[in-house]
Amino acid sequence: EDSGTEPSMNFLFDNSHFTDIEAAEGGCYLITNGLGGYSCLDLAGGTSRNDHAIFMAAVKAPNVRYNMITNLLIDMTVDGIIYHLSTQRMADDSFTDNFKYIEKVCFDSNMFSMVFNVRNVRLELCIVMPHGENTLMLNYHISNPECHDVELRLTPLLRFTPKNTAMKADAEFSIREYATDKADAKFPIREYAVAKQLLNSTNNEKMNGGTRDSSDVNCCEEFPANAIIIEGNDLRVVCASNMDVELLSQNSLYSMRWTLDTRDGRDDTGSCVINHCLKKRTSEPDCENVIVYSLCAPEDILSRVQNDIVNAFNKAAADEKARIADIVNHSGLKSELGRQLAAGADAYIVERESTGGKTIIAGYPFFEDWGRDTMIALGGTTLATARYSDCRSILKTFAKYEKNGLLPNLFPEGGMTPMYNSADAPLLFVNAVYE
């Protein structure tokens, strides 16, 4: 089959799907990065599980995962009227029903998009995760044919906790603007603290009607930052954007209820920290606002986005679309179902850092790469899709740790001994080799 043929894997839901909050929470998208990290929210863009996050990073592939950015709240002002576009159930079980503004959502080629329509101003959010790295790229594209006065305001919900772990109430975060050391740097050197320093009594006195000189950066300080560093819980995220950054006067908590966890008997409430927002005001007919979050080195990210961050997003999206198309076409599968299998299976084939080989995640968001499940899944994920080199790598990964005729059913992280508690795994291993 022609390798240039694009697979048909478009899942589209229009506004008729979003009839109530239950429908809004009734499905989710999944974007993966090949490391075990992912982006997963419900179809209306909210969280209905503790393990939902717009940016879940795998700090050690594939199982040491951290909920970095749970979500970004979306507010759009049109001619002075504020429209809250995010849909989320709150800790007191109240909820925002802003799914009514959704025109459509679409999942295609490991990317997700959703379109809001407010008074003929369309806001399209597109999400992509470049393969093989802990990076999330977001494009908030404003189409404004009638040239309304529009302000887009995005509020990140910071978590920085291990997956499925509650954030501590006293969690501290800091923000500083990234600075290059080049003489012609576009990123001036400035430091901003928004943790204890921001909340001390002296600063509070200044914010509550006292005098305030130009050196204070505590009360809704704005700066045209092209890149900031967000730090918390001994982790650091680079945020690059063509939007302006506004620091809030103090950290605040945003509390949520996760109804799918209520159903399953898990802890169903939790909080995130809010300490800044990103915003853009425009009356242009077309405006693209890109945000990049990454655990990569700041200089690596900025080398890609510094000159044209919109083009960097478009390239990442095109690269991911081409990667999925190559996987599907290489599989040789002709039916729509078979091609869907080839595309979908890619989400579960990930790197294992400890062995330097491939492995298979048993499922998102809960499961890890278990030996028995991996051997069961080999046929459908690798053999049926002609991913023979990946199959070979996975078999070698597990064979390396053979012990007394058994294969590891679990690779505990942190140098611990693998668990050998599955008699099925070696039998399924032999079957996979035979096939």
Task: Indicate residue ranges for each PLM-predicted region.
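Acidic, mature catalytic/reactive cores of soluble proteins
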Residues: 1-435
